[in-house]
């Protein structure tokens, strides 16, 4: 089998810039630092960061968010749902660096098949969404783990979102992938995965783990029997 990466386009990639704006992380870091200071001065058992929902009694240390190496452009903690489909990227978000703490990064998306330039098409069609209801996932060891949905920090509930990309259709055209010579090749589109750091539960403790999410749509080829180049 031969794998071909589908032509990248705005709706199948991580939001423009391949990273959450620095302003968002700066604001997040400021809030976490504030939560840490309050946690140190609060009575025992009254820490300001805890898991919401079914595991609301489990405490999460705000220091978990301080390490830059744990950040991923496909994982976002936000107090508001990211836009499902934004017309354009908000220039003020990156240009001025004045994004409010609970704003999310906006990126250009389209519900129809994208065309970069006239006559150019993607081999496979993909769709990208922010997933905010993930409860379980497969970690890098192949084990199913619990994913934390919400974290309460300083009385603000931050939800954990994942930017996932998957194939819209395994066969965008009758013969399989778009633009493939069906006389010599069998083809189909398939969703591929990668691993990102996500906040999960490890026993009764919150911990970062690599979990698998959908991140791309690629074309898989196999040569038809009896055909030679």
From Swiss-Prot:
Signal peptide per UniProt: 1-6
Pfam family, one: NGF
UniProtKB keywords: Cleavage on pair of basic residues, Disulfide bond, Endosome, Glycoprotein, Growth factor, Lipid-binding, Metalloenzyme inhibitor, Metalloprotease inhibitor, Protease inhibitor, Secreted, Signal
Single GO term (MF): growth factor activity
Residue ranges of the region described as Disordered: 77-112
Residue positions binding a 1-acyl-sn-glycero-3-phospho-L-serine: 197
Binding locations of a 1-acyl-sn-glycero-3-phospho-(1D-myo-inositol): 161, 197
One of the GO BP terms on file: nerve growth factor signaling pathway
Family: Belongs to the NGF-beta family.
Assembly: Homodimer. The homodimer interacts with a single NTRK1 chain. The homodimer interacts with a single NGFR chain. The NGF dimer interacts with a single SORCS2 chain (via extracellular domain). The NGF precursor (proNGF) binds to a receptor complex formed by SORT1 and NGFR, which leads to NGF endocytosis. Both mature NGF and the immature NGF precursor (proNGF) interact with SORCS2 and with the heterodimer formed by SORCS2 and NGFR (via extracellular domains). The NGF precursor (proNGF) has much higher affinity for SORCS2 than mature NGF.
Function per UniProt: Nerve growth factor is important for the development and maintenance of the sympathetic and sensory nervous systems. Extracellular ligand for the NTRK1 and NGFR receptors, activates cellular signaling cascades to regulate neuronal proliferation, differentiation and survival. The immature NGF precursor (proNGF) functions as a ligand for the heterodimeric receptor formed by SORCS2 and NGFR, and activates cellular signaling cascades that lead to inactivation of RAC1 and/or RAC2, reorganization of the actin cytoskeleton and neuronal growth cone collapse.
Protein known as: Beta-nerve growth factor
Organism whose genome encodes this protein: Sus scrofa
Phylogenetic placement of the source organism: Eukaryota, Metazoa, Chordata, Craniata, Vertebrata
Gene giving rise to this polypeptide: NGF
